[in-house]
């Protein structure tokens, strides 16, 4: 493992670097009309994970990009996490990745090029695991290290899973534990105990391949990955877009080990507060601990799946085959005009 501490060279970390939802809404308001493309099946109007273009014969091309600054100190692991996170958007749409190209920003006068090579190698290893080539890319001299991928995938048009097509009565599942932002903040602050160093990276480096299997089920009505806006933010996008509201069982939420310890040590990412400031008014009442977990920015987080009862048993069988033990975390119902998300303690 490298002795370089990459997190000391960036002001943010992972998906916690994302611009807050409130500010992003302002940025994306445009006076210029976009091209009206009849083949564009999924664009940015629904705040979805990737774009999808109809290429005929019932097939769609899925296109996405994701990049960020270091969330861990080890360069190779940083590359793995960034690549896993970028490819996840393809799986979240129900697609199969087919090729990736790299995006690299590097402070060439501060960090040796050999360290950047380790980052790229980490990304290449994950691409190999996903069964795709890292086929090229683009690099610039930048004040802080940045790495990510632009990924292209393919999906049957009748298997696309969007984030705004959930239905009242759907059961909610989450495929990875929460708390990634909390533990990586502990690392950046120098408070992470050595025996806990692999808890977050192990989760972040796990590909969301199972999304492609879930997409085969017609009763999976909506799917998205949980990243920088936290569980609350990405569930809110699902609820607002679908015209539903959610009731979550807080005790059922999967959490990384030691999350509460590091919360007690003050390891709350800045992104948590930015997230709550952006959408907290649309959430039901919750205490500080609940807020800090619900709004915790995840990097390479799990899939949030809304499934009808008719496909729930099949979804759980697929998860079991993949070595995942899933439990329901909540349920959706028709929006009643109050808060979109209620958390039951």
From Swiss-Prot:
Gene that encodes it: selD
The cross-references to CDD domains, in alphabetical order and at most eight, read: SelD
GO MF, one term, reads:
magnesium ion binding
What is any one GO biological process for this UniProt entry?
selenocysteine biosynthetic process
This chain belongs to the protein called Selenide, water dikinase
Q: How does it assemble?
A: Homodimer.
Q: Where is this site: Important for catalytic activity?
A: 18
Q: Which HAMAP family match?
A: SelD
Q: Which cofactor does it need?
A: Mg(2+)
From which source organism is this entry? Aeromonas salmonicida (strain A449)
Q: Which UniProt keywords apply?
A: ATP-binding, Kinase, Magnesium, Metal-binding, Nucleotide-binding, Selenium, Transferase
Describe the function of this protein: Synthesizes selenophosphate from selenide and ATP.
Could you say which protein family the record assigns here? Belongs to the selenophosphate synthase 1 family. Class I subfamily.
* Entry binding sites for Mg(2+): 49, 89, 225
Tell me yes or no: is Metal-binding among this UniProt entry's keywords: yes
Recorded catalytic reaction(s): these are: hydrogenselenide + ATP + H2O = selenophosphate + AMP + phosphate + 2 H(+)
- Tree of life domain: Bacteria
What GO cellular component term, any one, is given?
A: cytoplasm
Q: Does the keyword Endoplasmic reticulum apply?
A: no
Residues binding ATP: 18, 46-48, 66, 89, 137-139
Q: Which Gene3D superfamilies did the record assign?
A: PurM-like C-terminal domain, PurM-like, N-terminal domain
**Active-site residues, as the UniProt record annotates them:** 15
The note on the cofactor says: Binds 1 Mg(2+) ion per monomer.
């Amino acid at each position: 493992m490298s002795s370089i501490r990459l997190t000391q060279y960036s002001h943010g970390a992972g998906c916690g670097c994302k611009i807050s939802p409130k500010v992003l809404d302002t940025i994306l308001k445009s006076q210029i009309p976009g091209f009206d493309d009849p083949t564009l099946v999924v664009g940015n109007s629904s705040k979805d994970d990737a774009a999808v273009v109809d290429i005929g014969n019932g097939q769609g091309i899925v296109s996405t990009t994701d990049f960020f600054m270091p969330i861990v100190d080890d360069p190779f692991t940083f590359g793995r996490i960034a690549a896993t996170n970028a490819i996840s958007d393809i799986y979240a749409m129900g697609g199969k990745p087919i090729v990736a190209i790299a995006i690299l920003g590097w402070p060439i006068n501060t960090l040796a090029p050999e360290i950047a090579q380790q980052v790229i190698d980490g990304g290449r290893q994950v691409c190999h695991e996903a069964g795709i080539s890292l086929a090229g890319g683009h690099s610039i001299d930048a004040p802080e290290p940045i790495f990510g991928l632009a990924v292209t995938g393919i999906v049957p048009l009748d298997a696309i899973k969007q984030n705004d097509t959930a239905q009242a009565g759907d059961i909610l599942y989450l495929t990875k534990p929460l708390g990634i932002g909390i533990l990586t903040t502990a690392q950046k602050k120098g408070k992470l105990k050595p025996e806990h160093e692999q808890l977050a990276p192990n989760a972040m480096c796990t590909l969301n391949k199972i999304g492609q299997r879930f997409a085969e089920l017609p009763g999976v009505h909506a799917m998205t990955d949980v990243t920088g806006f936290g569980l609350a933010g990405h569930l809110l996008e699902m609820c607002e877009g679908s015209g539903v509201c959610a009731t979550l069982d807080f005790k059922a939420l999967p959490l990384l080990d030691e999350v509460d310890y590091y919360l007690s040590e003050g390891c709350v990412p800045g992104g948590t507060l930015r997230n709550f400031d952006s959408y907290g008014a649309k959430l039901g009442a919750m205490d500080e601990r609940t807020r800090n977990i619900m709004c915790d920015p995840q990097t390479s987080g799990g899939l949030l799946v809304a499934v009808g009862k008719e496909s729930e048993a099949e979804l759980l069988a697929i998860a079991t085959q993949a070595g995942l033990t899933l439990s329901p975390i909540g349920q959706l119902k028709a929006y009643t005009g109050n808060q979109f998300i209620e958390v039951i303690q």
